[in-house]
Amino acid sequence: MPTSTTPAVERIARVLAARQLSLNGGGSDPHAAQAVDETWRDHVEDAYAILHTLREPDADMAQAGDVAVWRSMIGAVLERRVGA
């Protein structure tokens, strides 16, 4: 299975920043890549909040896969925050 080299928290924070800044996401900047690079860290707490909410899968998610694996994966990200 392919994995990302960018941590999940950073990827989520970048999406949140892009949604605010990018014309594609509802912002006003048609070329927001540099601004996202400069501001994604402002969204890290929101990214952790999203992951915290997702730590328990919903019924459809649980039916599609292994709940213990899901909890372990999300938990690994959240534990890094505590250890930071």
Question: What is each residue range found by the language model?
Answer:
Residues 12, 42-45:
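Beta-rich globular "head" domains
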Residues 2-35, 49-70, 81-84:
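Amphipathic alpha-helical oligomerization segments
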